Amino acid sequence: MLDLTKFTTEQRNQKSMDLDTMTSLQIVTTMNDEDLRAVQSVTKVLPQVATAIDWAAEALERGGRVFYMGAGTSGRLGVLDASECPPTFGVSPDLVVGLIAGGETAFIKAVEGAEDSEELGASDLRERGLSDKDLVVGLAASGRTPYVVGGLAYAKATGCKTIAIACNQGSKIGESADLAIEPVPGPEVLTGSTRLKAGTVQKLILNMISTGAMVKIGKVYQNLMVDVQQTNEKLVVRGQNIVMEVTGCTRERAVQALADAGGHVKTAIVSVLLDCDAAQAAVALERAHGHVRTAVSGHEKSNADVQ
């Protein structure tokens, strides 16, 4: 029988032993204190997270994909982070992919037995044509989920680089992956409920990996989302504001530049800063491999120049 008590994520938290007698304020104070400890645990693994960013960027730049895979909360967090990449960074939904044991149904309803199948983890990657250009990131709070173990084993056999994110040190998935990221947020306020601190920690790390990788491949200029997709009124205005913020131009000029660029924010920025048409701006961006800073290097205008 599996001994869960050896996992810190399954142990009892001594600070919440009387959780059922606490007032509401005591409950939230205890949870907040424990959340702070969880956040602090990420500090110890920042060098590994930085390596993960570099590996993800390298995979994307060579035409590969990044796969997140997990079960339950871990799987849902991977799907959540992956699904935010297209609207935020203007990338294809096939570029960063979240896989959850049991498929889409498992996102809202538990699928019995799905996480216990190593073969399911392998087959989910096989069905998506995994290649050695790709990167696979396995997520499991316990660090032992069979679905993730099987996926990582298949990925390694395919020649992929692999990363494991677990909330226990010396985890099974960590030992099998090329890179182990193992923060230790400690026992949960509600014993074994890894949707809490363990989930928070995993989400923080995924935020860093996806954001950092997108910065590295040119999806960000300064600290602005210059590849944001303008899919609603708010994002249309945001696109205009970004062009205005970067170039110092008027809204009227930003609107026109975006129209000429087919709504592509980066092209609009470069066209204003280089005082060229959208086609020329697109060429400059292509030569710079999509990096705005490189495309406009030495050509930045003062606000007065671009009104």
Where in this protein do the model-derived segments appear?
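Cofactor-/ligand-binding subdomain signature composed of acidic, glycine-rich
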Residues: 1-41, 45
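A short, well-structured juxtamembrane/interface segment
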Residues: 44-59
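Short, amphipathic alpha-helical interaction segments embedded in low-complexity terminal/linker regions
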Residues: 208, 213-307
